[in-house]
Swiss-Prot record:
tRNA-binding keyword on record: no
Entry's transmembrane regions: 9-29
Membrane topology: Single-pass membrane protein
Identification of the protein by name: Putative flagella-related protein G
Native source organism of the sequence: Methanococcus voltae
PANTHER family assigned: ARCHAEAL FLAGELLA-RELATED PROTEIN F-RELATED (PTHR42200), FLAGELLA-RELATED PROTEIN G-RELATED (PTHR42200:SF1)
Compartment(s): Cell membrane; Archaeal flagellum
Gene Ontology BP annotations: archaeal or bacterial-type flagellum-dependent cell motility
GO molecular function: structural molecule activity
Keywords: Archaeal flagellum, Cell membrane, Membrane, Transmembrane, Transmembrane helix
Family: Belongs to the archaeal FlaG family.
Domain of life of the organism encoding this protein: Archaea
Gene: flaG
Gene Ontology cellular component list: archaeal-type flagellum; plasma membrane
Pfam families: Arch_flagellin (PF01917)
Length: 150
């Protein structure tokens, strides 16, 4: 009789240990999933609040006397965008081009494009005709524009 009691106690304790281990694993997994969702939500929120548009006239993309082409961007998001030639990339017809300078309209010394502000990119590209421009920010936000350099 006593051996049955000990067997049942051992089985009961074993079940308790297994149950505790399984619940610990489930709690840890749930916590990791929760953290992952929170991080992805923060990243998506950051991308949604940082947005811009290329506002050039498609029929008249300006080229100045030093053969640099000007691309105008407007920050249409709620958060400022880093506006520096080191963190912005420009592709013309799929090929990367050098940005010679960046300017924020109204204050050329600022390197942050605030909400609703307009910035100007000077790119070293001077071939006339229709071209496809793609601007990519450091946050990975990209906009494409087709226009004629005159």
């Amino acid at each position: 009789m006593a051996s049955n009691v000990f067997s049942e106690i051992i089985l009961f304790v074993s079940v308790l240990i297994i149950t505790a281990a399984v619940s610990g694993i489930l709690a840890t997994s749930t916590h990791k999933i929760s953290l992952g969702l929170e991080q992805r939500g923060d990243a998506l929120s950051s991308q949604l609040t940082k947005d811009f548009e290329i506002i050039n006239d498609p029929g008249y993309v300006l080229k100045n006397a030093t053969d640099t082409t000007m691309i105008y961007l407007k920050n249409t998001g709620k958060s400022p965008i880093t506006f520096d030639k080191e963190v912005i990339s420009v592709l013309v017809d799929g090929n990367p081009v050098e940005i010679s300078n960046t300017y924020v309209e109204g204050d050329s010394s600022v390197r942050v494009l605030g909400s609703s502000k307009v910035g100007k990119l000077h790119i070293t590209y001077n071939t006339s005709g229709y071209h496809r421009f793609k601007v990519v920010t450091s946050e990975g936000i990209a906009r494409t524009f087709t226009g004629e350099i005159v």
